[in-house]
Amino acid sequence: MKLRYKSTRNSQLRLTASQAIAQGISEEGGLFVPESFLDLTQQLPSLLQMDYKTLAKAIFQLFLTDFTKEEIANCVEQAYAAEKFGGAQPVKVTPLTKHGEPKFLLEL
């Protein structure tokens, strides 16, 4: 099933993920949001076991339904390539750093 996106300012305007990405913002200035929420209750245990890139691919496949699995995998691999993160292996996309007890910061 293809997930469609609607404008927050015009619920009659419905686009595919690729159309919403290409357009950016609706003519009325609204944002494009999924027209329904996905229930990930059943998938949650397996999603929590995935590394960052595998999780990104799985989530994108759920929300970007008009892209192929290969297109999504290629985009994720390019976006999270080691050279974009100082060559670190494994890539530290969102490092968690300790700043005292019990303070941690998630770097985005």
What are these regions (language model features)?
Residues 1-108:
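PLP-dependent amino-acid enzyme catalytic core
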